[in-house]
Amino acid sequence: GMMNTHFVNCCGLDADGHETTARDVAYMSRELINKYPEIHNYSTIWMDTITHSTRRGNSEFGLTNTNKLIKQYEWATGLKTGSTSLAGFCLSATANKNDIELIAVVMHAPNGKERVADCISLLNYGYGIVSRYEDVNPRKYLKFA
């Protein structure tokens, strides 16, 4: 689990004692996508329009995804960007290529472009060294009476 993380707030802003590691962010991301795979239905949206309704009427405003990886990496499926003065530019990136799902985490990048470039490098490296394994001789389990 997340052995090197201590959150002191839920918003992710800098605070004394608020700390995590790239590995722990990857664990947290894995849990999120495993338990709630529908998150990709939202994290892959590039732009959308929201209608805000009040007694005075309706108003629309546009939202653009802060995760530029969605537009720059063919297999990107999400997931979460963030930046603070102490953490720098961070990204927990998920991708799915040939039914292989990978997570890449970049922390403390100097800017948004480099966090995306670093995630692309990590994902490309991962896809270059992994392949899907299919067990041609699945284990036969014995049943004991």
What are these model-derived regions, one by one?
Residues 2-6, 10-145:
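Domain-terminus/edge residues, biased toward the C-terminal soluble/receptor-binding domains
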